[in-house]
């Protein structure tokens, strides 16, 4: 088979199963409204859960820092790209989340891959929730360690997998809030089981940080859990982008030596780091608390209204509210029907989710108003098949 035939066959297979992904060009994609092709839509696809991407205080912090530092970092943090803004943000994050150290990464994907790639060796074992993010599972598959996946949120299955003999070290991998199902992991029980088997715990709290817990400290704080490795990302609740790994002093020093994604990548712009510090200040403030409370009320309003419809609603109380449709074609038709009525929603299909569980991944944000939720419910009820 030629290279071109391989490419063509893969694309043909995606088209045949209605799983071909596409991008939409938008003029505005975060916040309450999405603008595409000159039309305005209520935006139910954004991860900007607290509406901070449009916050004037955060925008101003970025602008002022860009004037001071320029628009790029100029290199890896190991060469010349570790500025006072980066150091300040790392120290603020570590203090906020109660860890000795925080290390910044350019994305959550890079952070997850870096940690697993650097830590895991031959004869080690990774035991991951089967619905863990692609960045975690891909890194686990590519590492020399054995990967075993436990049934989603099934702590008994997790315990059985950890009990089987392992010559090396074991790492348990889970998420705080799951990106496609919107539900939360039983973190306290998972941590208890991991410690009983002398395993370390890695929690990716991309969708919980900033949004849940006291001062927005995330799902781990909310559940009274402190994993050995906590990954937080800044493209959701923080409204910016990037990520950080929270860990011990020695693990941070280890990652600085052996995490290739960190060593060989240009660091985030200092202006971005300063904007993230401004975002953190908002998240920790009374305003941040009010934003979280408003979001929680909107989620409750949506769930109370959609229960009367004909869609399958998962047990999710986060900003992520997936409606399971099942069939790929039906999910695409439903997303298009909502867009025709002025509501922008995204159809998620395999391989992102398991076969037969195609869905609308609806996300609610603090930028929405109660009338927006009511409009979404009205359109959903009218579009049900």
From Swiss-Prot:
Name of the protein described by the UniProt record: 8-amino-7-oxononanoate synthase
Pathway field: Cofactor biosynthesis; biotin biosynthesis
Job description of the protein: Catalyzes the decarboxylative condensation of pimeloyl-[acyl-carrier protein] and L-alanine to produce 8-amino-7-oxononanoate (AON), [acyl-carrier protein], and carbon dioxide.
Binding of substrate, residues: 21, 133, 352
UniProt xrefs under InterPro entries: Aminotrans_II_pyridoxalP_BS (IPR001917), Aminotransferase_I/II_large (IPR004839), AON_synthase_class-II (IPR050087), AONS_Archaea/Proteobacteria (IPR004723), AONS_Proteobacteria (IPR022834), PyrdxlP-dep_Trfase (IPR015424), PyrdxlP-dep_Trfase_major (IPR015421), PyrdxlP-dep_Trfase_small (IPR015422)
Modified residues (N6-(pyridoxal phosphate)lysine): 236
A GO molecular-function descriptor: 8-amino-7-oxononanoate synthase activity
Residues given in the record as pyridoxal 5'-phosphate binding sites: 108-109, 179, 207, 233
One Pfam family linked to the record: Aminotran_1_2
Subunit structure: Homodimer.
Catalytic activity: 6-carboxyhexanoyl-[ACP] + L-alanine + H(+) = (8S)-8-amino-7-oxononanoate + holo-[ACP] + CO2
Species of the source: Salmonella paratyphi C (strain RKS4594)
Entry annotated with the keyword Acetylation: no
EC number: 2.3.1.47
Entry's family note: Belongs to the class-II pyridoxal-phosphate-dependent aminotransferase family. BioF subfamily.
UniProt keyword list: Biotin biosynthesis, Pyridoxal phosphate, Transferase
Cofactor(s) demanded: pyridoxal 5'-phosphate
GO biological process: biotin biosynthetic process
Top-level taxonomic group: Bacteria
